[in-house]
Amino acid sequence: MKEIRSDMRELNGLVMGKMKERGLQCSSHPPSDWATGTGANFSGDVSFFERGPNEPIPTTFGDVLETDDGTGFGILSGDDLMLRLSTELEVTHCIFLIGDSDGIMTSPPGEKDSKLIPHFGPDTIISGKHDSDIDVTGGIGLKIDRSLEIAKIVEEVWIIDGRKPDRVVDLLASGETIGTKILSG
């Protein structure tokens, strides 16, 4: 547990370093410092993520947390954090960054005929299955479920390729980018 927590803080430090290089001031808020439990109903007050225009950008990430369910600890997914932050705070955009494709694909990214789905709604169908041996946090399925919930409240919900940071800039500047826009239905 300590090793995973340490690794997550190290990764967050790298992300914050890149943001600082771009002139952005950030503050780090590891969930293990302020939350308990897992899933969308984890315990923890997210109101301190509200900020004024001249205050540092608060950052957080998926983490190993203590639980009250008898297991002792569990993984709080960043997707569940996104759900709480997006639905409890005044949010204009919710952007999920993934690392293996341009956005949601018709089938797993490595498959021959897999194509980007530019708009994804509650009735959109994809193929594939989640491998919980590789990803214990829910994979793309949880990301899709949470993004659909968020889209009921937040108009601009996207899943895009995090390996291409200019796409975030394009989205914020023009309202469009290569990726998948999540529709409320």
PLM feature segments, named:
Residues 1-185:
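C-terminal catalytic "cap/lid" subdomain
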